[in-house]
Amino acid sequence: MKYTSYFLALLLCGLLGFSGSYGQGQFFREIENLKEYFNASSPDVAKGGPLFSEILKNWKDESDKKIIQSQIVSFYFKLFENLKDNQVIQRSMDIIKQDMFQKFLNGSSEKLEDFKKLIQIPVDDLQIQRKAINELIKVMNDLSPKSNLRKRKRSQNLFRGRRASM
């Protein structure tokens, strides 16, 4: 798990970019600290291939990419939560989390709190499962209105175009 954690922290750097409120140099130093701590340069880290970069290659559209990135960011937040008591790497994780927070959640504390709540929901709890199934229709409806709205607007524009040319 230690090698995997380190490798994931390294991938985070490439996934989310290198700029941020702490600057490139600071961000790179913190990634290097994590690499050293987890011995991520060891050849056995590469066994089995990368965790996320191959998956990300399949997601070309920017809005689609956000979907998979949200799952990856969720993973990193869980990883950092599991390592929160490790004082040796705490500062590095805090800086990386802050940069991730700025890039992925646009610095919104409310979004961060909601995101944390979501990743903490236990999926093996029967009451949670029942609530989730109860809300499934609403969630599915929330997922689809944008595409229906676009189709409706496109249809209206086509209809208007026909009326104008008649």
From Swiss-Prot:
Residues carrying a glycan: 39, 106
Gene Ontology MF terms in the entry: cytokine activity; type II interferon receptor binding
Region forming the signal peptide: 1-23
GO cellular component: extracellular space
UniProt cross-references to InterPro entries, sorted A to Z: 4_helix_cytokine-like_core (IPR009079), Interferon_gamma (IPR002069)
Tissue expression summary: Released primarily from activated T lymphocytes.
Keyword Lipoprotein recorded: no
Keywords linked to the UniProt accession: Antiviral defense, Cytokine, Glycoprotein, Growth regulation, Pyrrolidone carboxylic acid, Secreted, Signal
Modified residues (Pyrrolidone carboxylic acid): 24
Localization (cell): Secreted
Biological processes, Gene Ontology terms: adaptive immune response; astrocyte activation; cell surface receptor signaling pathway via STAT; defense response to virus; extrinsic apoptotic signaling pathway; Fc-gamma receptor signaling pathway involved in phagocytosis; humoral immune response; macrophage activation involved in immune response
One Pfam family hit: IFN-gamma
Superkingdom, natural source: Eukaryota
Predominant place of localization: secreted
Family per record: Belongs to the type II (or gamma) interferon family.
PANTHER family, per the entry: INTERFERON GAMMA
Quaternary context: Homodimer. Interacts with IFNGR1 (via extracellular domain); this interaction promotes IFNGR1 dimerization.
Protein name: Interferon gamma
Protein's organism: Bos taurus
Gene: IFNG
